[in-house]
Amino acid sequence: MANLTSDQMPDTVGGPGPFTFDLPVDAGSKVYKGSLCTQLTATGMVVPYSTAAAGVVVGVADHAADLTAAGTSDGDKRVRIQTKRMFAFTNGTAGDAFSEATLIGSLVYGTDDNTVAKTSNSQARKAVGFFYGMESDGKVRVLVDPALAAIVNVLQGLTDTPASADALRDNIVAAFG
């Protein structure tokens, strides 16, 4: 294909967001409508966000899904996830609370499936998105973006301090395979 020689808009695939997609729910989990959700690294199943869940934050549940009954298996139900969208979450407390003075674009970390905080708590919390202001009721506006949050989480897990841009690039390549 040749380079463009005049204005032309490419076809859009999905648009700029928000995106919705259905993911399988982990057996033993109950996802509430509005829960911040994590996709587990080991199985690909979705669970409500918690600091203990190993995986990436993927978005917010559009409806409830309950797989806590005996005899249920991974993926018996799916939950629709909304992502790359702005959501309002409960603000953290004390030194972890956001305020109007917080800079737009600051990282936001999850503390549970409905609460966010300003710090990673020594990397115990995962990044879930970016700060976009405060609501009048004190809730925090967060742009939930799993791709960018995953990059931040990997970079924060690096144990060395790269000496150069080349070393940083090597770390990123190693982290993402």
PLM regions with names:
Residues 1-177:
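Surface-exposed, low-hydrophobicity beta-strand/loop segments enriched in small/polar/acidic residues
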